[in-house]
Amino acid sequence: MIAIIAEKPSVGQDIARVIGATEKKDGYMAGNGYLVTWALGHLVSLAMPSAYGYGKASHEDLPMLPEPFQLVVRQIKTDRGMVTDISASKQLKVIDEVFSKCDSIIVATDAGREGELIFRYIYHYLGYTKPFKRLWISSLTDEAIRAGMSNLKDGEAYDSLYHAADCRAKADWLVGMNASRALALASGMPNNSLGRVQTPTLAMICSRYKENRDFVSTPYWQLHITLERLGEFRQFAHIEDFKSKEQAEATHARFSPDSTALITKVERKRTYQQAPLLYDLTTLQKDCNTHHDMSAEKTLSVAQALYEKKYISYPRTGSRYISHDLMEQVYDSLWKIATMPEFKEYGKRFDFEHLNMRSVDDDKVTDHHALIITGVEPEELNAHEQIVYTMIAGRMLEAFSPRCEKESLVMEATAEDMKFRSRSTTIVNPGWRAVFARKEDAEKDETEANKGTARFTEGEQIPVTGYGTAQRKTIPKPLYTEATLLAAMETCGRNITDEKAKEAMKELGIGTPATRAAIITTLFKRDYIERSGKALVPTEKGLYIYEAVKDMQVANVELTGSWEKTLLQIEQHTLETRSFMHSIESFTSQVTREVLGLKFPAPKQRSLPCPKCGTGKVMIRPKVAKCDNPDCGLLVFRKVLNKELNEQHLEQLLSSGTTKLIKGFKGKKGNSFDAAVAFDDEFNVTLAFPEKKRGKKR
């Protein structure tokens, strides 16, 4: 008998159906010589500090360096603290029963670091030593499962992948647990946390926010002239900006209705914009955020759902290339995409005979290839699934389309002994850009705001028919959006536009394609950042933490990127795990010392007018907001269910009696809902739910 373990029930049931294990049991499927069971995500994880005898945070216990680390059944946070997840415990017993009945195991968890870790932690926790093989596939279609089952890999071949995942988990534990406890001791605020990856990411957001907020805009002036001939005109700009209005006006005064300009240079150049590579997860997340305002977490969850429905390949990929042996499948997919309603017009002229092959490179495909659609026809996609599927399908058309051909035109002229310049770009052949034909893409082609279409010849003398000045001002770097933050995480904050250079930097990025969405989500959950429109900005709490640790190693973006590279070296057999763990333990000790040595200023205690008594001041403290009038008694606990009210929420509640809608409350049964926090008639805190929209009567 052979056991197969998948990562989720739906995947396990699909595999069972394909291999003929059709008899349904409690927590597994049986038949045809197989027992197919499944995990429910991470059933086993690293134990919390209490398992090693550590109580509340104390200076004497830090740094905590467990040796060895202990594994425990997944735990969940409740009002009584951390308790064992009953559903995880139950499924582990099923897995234990299945493994005990079988001679060998086939590992069918997701083909990546986390999928490998999920199985290995279960395997080690249950104490098994039975041999296992690896089902390593990039899609869940029936054909892919059959092909994978006939080409199983030795489990030992993925030991280094497991070691990298295990080291990453232990590194996160060491830095996160120790730095957070040190922060609690140094600041006197126990509910804040630091992390190996979350803190450098917070530092990037805070640094950009402060740079943007504190930017002092400087005015400057531009001088422009209009040249016209035979009813056609072109606007030229002075080659230098003026720092003062007086200087600009003095220069402007040199012109008269009789002024002419001599064309001194006309340069035409053909330029080409290569088709983009196929999507990896991060570029998909960036584009879904830019064009459809979807968060990185939402994009990943939708892509995962499409993968489990067999509509797309494995989503957590870091590759933007495919191998030559996939081209037959891709060719068939391109025919299908070309008939989709969204691409039908472009599909009529798509050149199937001369495909752009820059996304096809066997040497650049590692564990998984780029994101592509499968041959399975989608059925009943919801709105977000339709968006993500269309984005992936459209990117395939773009990637295999011709490059975009442009003509750039630069003209220079001399007028009144001054030099002027006009730049413009015209698309000659849109190539891949015609797939989506986005308006915002077309606007990027206008390199300067010069108007007109006239084209002059070198040596011509052209009348100056208009001239004027315009005031401009310098602008700061924009705040991060999720799309631009993801790009910055890939390059550790470096501004890199060249695609080849970006690919080379991937080894030094913060996080991985599979983890970046979770990092951003963690910052939201910690109340360290919030959204302002599409921008990500720090909360008061987030800025407070950043100011305290910004110069420390725990917030060092490039150092965090170097850790990612060492994890990749472990995965590639070029670095020993002991070497990495020794470095992380030393780093943890250093970070702990640094944080414990912090001198935190007492947080400013804000106060707001009391809406209940009208005379007292409501003092805002870390855990409560309380009126200072002893006869009033207004008291607001800042923790409501799983949410903590930030100062903005308290301002809304105390000034208008209700907060704005707060998303992501969790009830006692774990159900998620949205609500506002409000006062009732007696100033008790309650939840207010949005009214459901009623349809129009017919």
Language-model features, listed with the residues they occupy:
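Intrinsically disordered, low-complexity regulatory segments
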Residues: 1-169, 173-175, 476
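Conserved short loop/turn motifs at secondary-structure junctions
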Residues: 1-3, 110-111, 188-191, 268-277, ...
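C-terminal or mid-to-C-terminal helical accessory/interaction module adjacent to the motor/catalytic core
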Residues: 87, 100, 142-225, 268-269
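Metal- or metallocofactor-binding catalytic centers and their adjacent structured scaffolds
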Residues: 243-279, 285
